[in-house]
Amino acid sequence: MKIRFATIKDAPELLKIYEQYIDTPITFEEKIPSLYEYEQRIDNIIRRYPYLVCKSNNVIIGYAYAHRQMERDAYQWNAELSVYLLPDYTSRGFGKILYSILIDILKLQGIKNVYGGVTLPNEKSEKLHYALGFNKLGIYRNTGYKCGKWHDVIWFEKKISEYDPTPKRIKPINVINNEAIISVSYTHLRAHETLMN
């Protein structure tokens, strides 16, 4: 298994993974984005936030990324997380390791809180968030209509850093020390390998 930062060249493989969720309520998007549109999305995220891909046997099996939780400047110390895996690789610890590495990189950037939204029911994703120490914030009732029915979305929150009285602005991902990122990734990968053996 290898985890690295995503590039725009990964877009075709990432889009193929995402396509598998289009006909489900896991994403509220109803049409598959074009390859160009997906490339633009990746490009917009990697300018500021971590976007990770997980490879096994030289194939991308999943990806996870962080993005701005809300647009107003005072919200800049928050990030929302997303993770998508090929169906055969769910419930095997890959989502947990991707989320864990994302969170530790976000700490280096100065992020204070991370959030995750999960369309209900989704027991696997709920378990993932609780296992990583997220707290349930609340439920948006009947907030999305897809696949012929209304869906609730549960929101999770996790504090990942202390609240400074005068916080510094968030550091873009490209200014974070590479050695620190490698150290974070290595620690989580070793822990995952130990659990799998």
Which positions does each model-derived feature cover?
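Conserved GNAT acetyl-CoA-binding A-motif
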Residues: 107-118
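Conserved active-site alpha-helix within GNAT-family acetyltransferase domains
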Residues: 120-138
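A short beta-loop-alpha structural element at the N-terminal edge
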Residues: 2-16
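C-terminal "cap" of GNAT-fold acetyltransferases
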Residues: 142-185
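Conserved small/polar residues in nucleotide/adenosyl-binding loops
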Residues: 187-194
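Helix-loop element at the rim of GNAT/NAT acetyltransferase active sites that forms part
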Residues: 16-32
